[in-house]
Amino acid sequence: MKKIYFTFVALLATINMFAQGWPANYSGVMLQGFYWDSFSDSKWTHLEAQAPELGQYFNLVWIPQSANCGGKSMGYDDLYWFSNYNSSFGSEDELRSLIKSFKANGIGTIADVVINHRKNVSTWFDFPVETYKGVTYEMKSTDICANDDGGKTKKEADKQ
């Protein structure tokens, strides 16, 4: 039994040797620039102030959702997608300045967006209509998956 155990451990040790070093296609490191309820730590101005230092170590920074949610939120219940980028993390101008500073310091920006998380204006299916680059977007009750909650959403949509 000891021989079998020793052989197994020896095989595992040799497998681990292959995992050392950088992958052949390695091209950078990404930093998650936020955590849950990190409104002050992840403000656009706070992240921008760190851009020179972050640029020394990271190639990408993953930032939280930037759309307006109508209140203090991490952004996963966004109300506006195209027309209002004043979020819990700062204004649209501050966001644009952050992205510009990141680019100047060799950092790419990745935004965290969950498309199917929407906040409504007043009722269950009352989403704002927005126009972006001449195209008007309107989310209706029929745009919500009928089976994502056991049919409850479809029943509500059918009442509309």
Model-predicted regions and their roles:
Residues A10-L11:
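Short, linear, compositionally biased motifs with a strong N-terminal bias
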